[in-house]
Curated annotation (Swiss-Prot):
Catalyzes the conversion of heme O to heme A by two successive hydroxylations of the methyl group at C8. The first hydroxylation forms heme I, the second hydroxylation results in an unstable dihydroxymethyl group, which spontaneously dehydrates, resulting in the formyl group of heme A. Interacts with CtaB. Belongs to the COX15/CtaA family. Type 2 subfamily. This is Heme A synthase. It comes from Rickettsia conorii (strain ATCC VR-613 / Malish 7). It is found in: Cell membrane. GO terms for molecular function: metal ion binding; oxidoreductase activity, acting on NAD(P)H, heme protein as acceptor. The chain crosses the membrane at residues 6-26, 87-107, 119-139, 154-174, 192-212, 258-278, 285-305, 308-328. Heme binds at H256, H316. The gene is ctaA. Its EC number is 1.17.99.9. Pathway: Porphyrin-containing compound metabolism; heme A biosynthesis; heme A from heme O: step 1/1. Keywords: Cell membrane, Heme biosynthesis, Iron, Membrane, Metal-binding, Oxidoreductase, Transmembrane, Transmembrane helix.
Length: 337
C-alpha cells in the first residue's frame, strides 16, 4: 500500500515537472518570459483581476527595455496573453513544488520513506527550493539594459529542472522494482557504458538546445543537413576555438547539430546492444528508443527548416525528455541486473 502511494506521488510529480518544462518552453518561444517584472513567491499566486490591476501590471512592464525595444505599442489584450503564459509557468512551478514537498514531509514523519533512502529526495527538495530563485535570476538578466535573458542562465534553469525530473523518475522506476531476470553470465558491460554515455550526451544536447533558444539561433541557417551549402559555416571557420563563439548564434546552432549527430549515433549503438541480448524487456526499450529517437530527430529538423514553429519546437523539447527517460529506464534495468 505504502509503495503504491509513493509510486503514484512520484508519477504525478514527474508529470507536473514535464508540464512545467513544456510550458516554460512555450513561454520562451512566444517571448513571454519578461512580461512579469517582479518576483513575488507568495503574493504572486493570483493574477490581476480588475481592469485597474491589469493597467498597473502593464505600466510596470512599460518601464523595462523589452517594451521599448521589442513590444512597443502592444495593446493591453496582447500584454495579457504574454503575461498569462508567464503566470501559468510560474504557477505550475509552485504547484509542482507543493505536490512534491508536502507529501515528502508526510512520508518522512510517517516513516514511509526510510532515512537510508532519503538522500535523493532531499537533493530534489533542495533543487526545488532554489529553482524559483534561479528562474528569477534568469528573468532579471533581461530586465536591465538588454531586453533579452542570458542564454546561459536560461540553460542553467532548464538543466536544474531536468535534474529534478531525473531524480524523481529514477526513484519512480526504482520504487517499482522493475528489474531483469537474466542469467548472471550475460554481458551487460557495453549496454551499461552506452546507456551512460547516452544520458550524458542527451544532457549536453538539452543544455545546447536552451542556448539555441536563448540566442534565437534556430532562426538562422534554416537548412539541413548543410549550413548554406557548408558543413562548417564561414562565420566560425577561422576562429572555431574562440570562447566568444558561445555568444554567437551561428556557432551555437552548429554545435547543437554536431551533438545531435552524436546523440543519434550513441543511441543507435545502444539499441543494437540491447537487441543482441534478446530479452523481452530490453527489446521493448530498444523499440521505444527507436520511436523516441525518430521523433526527436525529425521534429528537430522540422523546427529548423520551418524557422521554429511553436508546436513543433515544443514537441521537440518534449521528446528530448521522453528520450532521456527511456535511456534512464534502460540504465536502471541493466544496472539492477
Amino acid at each position: 500500500m505504502q509503495k503504491s502511494l509513493i509510486t503514484k506521488w512520484l508519477c504525478i510529480s514527474c508529470i507536473m515537472v514535464i508540464a512545467t518544462l513544456v510550458i516554460g518552453g512555450i513561454t520562451r518561444l512566444t517571448g513571454s518570459g519578461l512580461s512579469i517584472v517582479e518576483w513575488r513567491p507568495v503574493t504572486g499566486i493570483l493574477p490581476p483581476f480588475s481592469f485597474e490591476s491589469w493597467q498597473s501590471e502593464f505600466a510596470k512592464y512599460k518601464a523595462f527595455p523589452e517594451y521599448n525595444s521589442v513590444n512597443y505599442g502592444i495593446t493591453l489584450s496582447q500584454f495579457k496573453f504574454i503575461y498569462l503564459l508567464e503566470f501559468i509557468h510560474r504557477l505550475l512551478g509552485r504547484i509542482t513544488a507543493l505536490i512534491y514537498i508536502v507529501p515528502l514531509i508526510y512520508f518522512y514523519f510517517k516513516d514511509v520513506i526510510k532515512n537510508r533512502d532519503m538522500l535523493p529526495y532531499i537533493i530534489a527538495l533542495l533543487l526545488f527550493c532554489v529553482q524559483g530563485f534561479i528562474g528569477w535570476y534568469m528573468v532579471k538578466s533581461g530586465l536591465l539594459n538588454s531586453p533579452y535573458v542570458s542564454h546561459f542562465r536560461l540553460a542553467f534553469h532548464l538543466i536544474i529542472a531536468v535534474i529534478i525530473y531525473h531524480i524523481l523518475f529514477y526513484q519512480l522506476i526504482k520504487n517499482r522494482c522493475d528489474i531483469l531476470l537474466i542469467p548472471s553470465q550475460t554481458d551487460f558491460k557495453l549496454p551499461l557504458i552506452f546507456s551512460g554515455i547516452a544520458i550524458t550526451v542527451v544532457y549536453v544536447q538539452i543544455f545546447l538546445g536552451a542556448l539555441v533558444a536563448g540566442l534565437d539561433a534556430g532562426l538562422i541557417y534554416n537548412s539541413f543537413p548543410l549550413m548554406d551549402d557548408r558543413f562548417i559555416p564561414m562565420e566560425i571557420k577561422d576562429n572555431f576555438f574562440d570562447l566568444k563563439n558561445w555568444y554567437d548564434p551561428v556557432f551555437i546552432q552548429f554545435i547543437h547539430r554536431l551533438v545531435g549527430y552524436s546523440v543519434f549515433l550513441v543511441v543507435v549503438v545502444l539499441i543494437s546492444c540491447l537487441l543482441k541480448i534478446e530479452h523481452p524487456k530490453l527489446n521493448k526499450i530498444a523499440y521505444f528508443l527507436m520511436i523516441a529517437l525518430f521523433m526527436q530527430v525529425s521534429t528537430g529538423i522540422l523546427t529548423l527548416l520551418y524557422s521554429v514553429p511553436i508546436i513543433i519546437a515544443s514537441i521537440h523539447q518534449l521528446f528530448a525528455i521522453i528520450l532521456l527517460s527511456i535511456i534512464i529506464w534502460c540504465y536502471f534495468l541493466i544496472k539492477s541486473s
